[in-house]
Amino acid sequence: MSAAGIDVLPKQCLLNWADRGGGAVTRLRALVLLVQFPDLPADAADHGVPYFESLMFGKGPLDTRTLRNFYLDNSYGTLSVEGDVYGWYTLPNSSSFYAKGSGGVCDTCYPRNAQGMAEDAVELARPFVDFSRYDNDGPDGVPSSGDDDGYVDALFVVHSGSTYEDTGNPGLIMSHQWNTVAPIPVNGVYAFVYTTEGESSKLGTFCHEMGHVLGLPDLYDRDYTSYGLDLWSLMAAGGWLG
C-alpha cells in the first residue's frame, strides 16, 4: 500500500485486532473537551454538552448515528466507546493564534499550533475533570486499577467553529490526531495523545479520528499519486460521507 502513496497498516494494529477475539466487550472511556476561541464563540445553545453526548456516546438502536454505535456495529458488538463531555471552556488565544496560517499543524510553531490549543484545553479542564478516569486500557478495563499505561486513552479536543478541511481556510484548525509537546501530568496520569475536531464537524470526522486512536492509519492518498481507498474506507474519503 505504501507504493500507492498511503500509509502502511502497522503490524501492531493487526496484532491488537487478533487479541480482541472471543466476543468479549471492550469498554473504552473517552474524554471530550469543548473549547471556544475568544474571537469565535461556540453556539452553545445548539452545540452544548448534550449535543456532543448524543453525537459521541448516544445509544439507542444501532442505526442511530453516533460514534459509539458505529464502532459497536463495526466491531460486531465487541467495542463500546463510552465517555463524558465537558465545556465549553474559553481558550486564552484566538483561532488565528493557534492556526498560524497552517491549520494548526506546524510542528515548529508551538505554542502557536494545535498542540498549544490542546495543552490549554487540558489546563482549563484540570479543575473540573478527573483525568484518571480515562486511563482504562489495561486487561480489566477499570480506570486506575494498576494495570493501565498511565496515559489518557482517548482525548477529543473539540474547538468552536469550522475547520481547515471543511473551508479551505488555513486560519482555522485542521482536524487531526497528534500529541502535545510533552506529556501533561494531571490526576496521576498523563494527557498526551489527542484528536481535535470542529464544533461543526460531522460524525464521519469524529469516527475517522477515533480510528487513529485505535491505531488505524490514513488510507487516503497522501502524496496525490493514487486514489487511496477513496469512499470505500472510513480512513480514506469515507470519513466525508457524513
PLM regions: where:
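Active-site-proximal segment of zinc-dependent metalloprotease catalytic domains
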Residues: M1-L241
